[in-house]
Amino acid sequence: MDESKKISLGQFFTPTHIVKYMIGLMTKNKNASILEPSSGNGVFLDSLIQLGYTNLTSYEIDGDIISHPFVINSSFITSYDKPQYDSIIGNPPYVRWKNLSELQKKELKDNSIWKMYCNSLCDYFYIFIIKSILQLKVGGELIFICPDYFFSTKNAEGLRKFLINNGSFEKIILFNESKVFHGVSSSVVIFKYIKGKNIDNINIINIDSKSPIKSEDIESLGESYYIPRFSSSDVWVTSPNHIKVALDKFESYCKTIKKVQPKSLFDDLEFSRIGSVCDIGNGMVSGLDKAFQMNDINYSELELLNSICVAKAKHLDAFCFSGYTRYKFILDDINEDKLITYFPNFFYEFNNYKDYLLKRYSYNKYLPYWKWAFLRNFSLFSKNEKKIFVPCKERISKKSNFRFSLVDEFIYPTQDVTALYKKENVKESIEYITAYLNSKAVFLWMKYKGVVKGNVVEFSEKPLANIPFRRIDWQLKSEKKIHDDITNLVRKYLSNKEFSILHEINLNLEKLGIKVEI
């Protein structure tokens, strides 16, 4: 199979035992009208036919992989949205916008549904879900297997709102890190959704195993429980209800008074969030780190002046960081002759990687091989103050804390790190904010309500900005004292690394309600 076609069409075919399980979720009779909107190699069709279903329709844009009397070899995206099917089942293509062909991108740009609910940050499978629901009869069932990140990502809010407004989920199977497809690392779910029906509770099957799924007896592999139906387009929490209650209690301590109008009797409460106390930015992009990293040689004074200290994810730990790497960093506009004259060691080292450097993504601008590809948030990172670094992604399957590190002045992050700088006029100390972010409460909140793909938590700007934050009531001497104690304890820990201090920090955080009791 052509690899570029496989990527642009999202051709990852479903194992037969998974198909049989999904068909087993169907409740319609053998004469029901059934659609498979992306047939792929026909595994769903073959299984449905073997089981006696006869009223079948399927779409497959790639005529090279299947020719079948039930298959329409054209794009499902352009099909007519008439409610006509009793059941829709399948494995929609998962393709990020950048991997779509130009023809596919044009098709989406011209599509009214895509323009209403999606954008170029969305995955291709989003529109398959929406169009499938539009083509279901009221009471019809949609059974799909797809990535789980539409439960939590910001770009899927439109999809989540559409799903809430047009029906409800009956069952969701969470595979987490279990391997379902060969060569696919994304965490996937199977869901059953009923159009136009209000189902009060969703049956969750939560499979907590890294082993490959080899049997259609899927429900015996995980924990089964029920949660209330989703009621908003915010992040969908699929954990048991007692965890949701504990998270709600923690969030209640992060609420502050919101003035509706001067002297109003109807003041409301709203969450204070990290985004209200910190400026947040993802790190800069060199495009080829090994070419910019400096070696143990005698660089000239000018070369050293044109370098920066970089802390990468590998340098970060909870509260502290273990070091940095010096990188070449020429800001001035020079030509190659001046590079050779004034930066001879840089030129020699760059020359070893020149072919690769010239092939970097240029962000639609002229990019000399000795320049960084994208100085994202450079002005923020140049502030002369301490800040907090965190890896952009963190696998948490065997961890109980994150790595929010308090980092010294004039150390810069690259693209595998996100930085948080305290906003001006925020009274809480950077040490207090660091302690808060490293708390068990924030770990659990991000685990269940953050942007999580499988067991990997994302720490880009928007997910970080959304974390509830416990502000200090400066009118209360008791809270001010706790804040000051935490600040001093963090400084003490950074000085001597005594683990007993971390326990003291946590005890003080708990006095402010910064805990999740599960």
Swiss-Prot record:
PROSITE patterns from the UniProt entry: N6_MTASE
Keyword Methyltransferase: yes
Catalytic activity, EC: 2.1.1.72
UniProt keyword annotations, A-Z: DNA-binding, Methyltransferase, Restriction system, S-adenosyl-L-methionine, Transferase
Gene Ontology biological process terms, A to Z: DNA restriction-modification system; methylation
A Pfam family it matches: N6_Mtase
Leader sequence segment: none
Catalysed reactions, as listed in the record: a 2'-deoxyadenosine in DNA + S-adenosyl-L-methionine = an N(6)-methyl-2'-deoxyadenosine in DNA + S-adenosyl-L-homocysteine + H(+)
Record's keyword annotation contains Repressor: no
GO molecular function: DNA binding; N-methyltransferase activity; site-specific DNA-methyltransferase (adenine-specific) activity
Similarity comment: family membership: Belongs to the N(4)/N(6)-methyltransferase family.
UniProt-recorded name of the protein: Type II methyltransferase M.HindII
Species: Haemophilus influenzae (strain ATCC 51907 / DSM 11121 / KW20 / Rd)
Gene (UniProt): hindIIM
